[in-house]
Amino acid sequence: MTFPRLILMVLFSIECGFLFAQEPLTIISYNVENLFDCQHDTLKDDYSFLPDGMHHWTYYRYQTKLDRIAQVIVNISGWESAALVGLCEVENTRCLLDLCYRLKRFHYKYVHYESDDERGVD
């Protein structure tokens, strides 16, 4: 056996040992389907998710939706927190901040990007 081949085999066996020592990770991708707060964003067409709008979106309904989303994330994660949670259809950072507050024991941080959606869904 040549020396380079021996080095390659040793490195491969060391790498495989590290692979087996890894902990499993939970990654969640979740379409929360229109997570809007109940305050108007002047730059967006979010009128249907206001108390007087088509969906009669109230503070109570917003809080209930946040509670349910948080419960789903906890149920999926089990005893360990998910390593990454990706959410779709979230209106703004306020919604993410409110959700992270409900999940504060997991110490989640968030990254938010504004989309070009007229309604404000990101």
Question: What is the meaning of each model-derived region?
Answer:
Residues 20-121:
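N-terminal, active-site-proximal structural segment of metallo-dependent hydrolase catalytic domains
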Residues 1-23:
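Bacterial Sec-dependent N-terminal signal peptides
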